[in-house]
Amino acid sequence: MDFHVMTLFPDMIMDGLNTSITGRAIKAGVMSVKAYDIREYSNDKHLKVDDYPYGGGAGMVMRAAPVCDCYEDIVRNIGKRPRVVYMTPQGYTFTQSMAEEFAKEDNLVILCGHYEGIDERALENIVTDFVSIGDYVLTGGELPAMAVSYTHLTLPTTERV
């Protein structure tokens, strides 16, 4: 399986997944992981990706344009529109059966939010699954994204390293 992680912190993803069992799995070709830096898709000279929520509200959200542009780049790279999992505390709780369902995909995009979340317009355009790893809030979706990636290696259908 190929994981494509959309994040503001690509080093956090790659450092976390390139170690231990997942690191060996990546080296052995059992799985691949590419982290996309959403900031690289900002058209702002300061690479700003946050803004006030469209329609008002408290806090800041990730802007729709950089998120959607990043996704479109992934689509161009793999040649199809893959399943997109948005890691959010408001999502369905991640389960073993969900891991098995995701494992049927050749490519899985995981979208990591920050701030108060992501502009709803981006979520409506690209997200297929809203997933949570528990009933608590973290500062971003990177740790949940790594948890989803790790579970792929525990499935009976996954080649052992």
Residue spans of the language-model regions?
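Conserved small/polar residues in nucleotide/adenosyl-binding loops
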Residues: 151-157
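Hydrophobic/aromatic beta-strand patches that form the interior of the parallel beta-sheet core
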Residues: 4-6, 34-36, 85, 108-109, ...
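Short beta->alpha connector loops at strand-helix junctions that form conserved
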Residues: 112, 130-141
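Short, glycine/polar-rich helix-capping loops at beta-to-alpha or helix-loop-helix junctions
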Residues: 116-123
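Glycine-rich, flexible N-terminal cofactor/catalytic loop recognition
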Residues: 2-40
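Short, structured active-site "lid" loops
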Residues: 49-69
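S-adenosyl-L-methionine/SAH cofactor-binding core of RNA-modifying enzymes
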Residues: 63-114
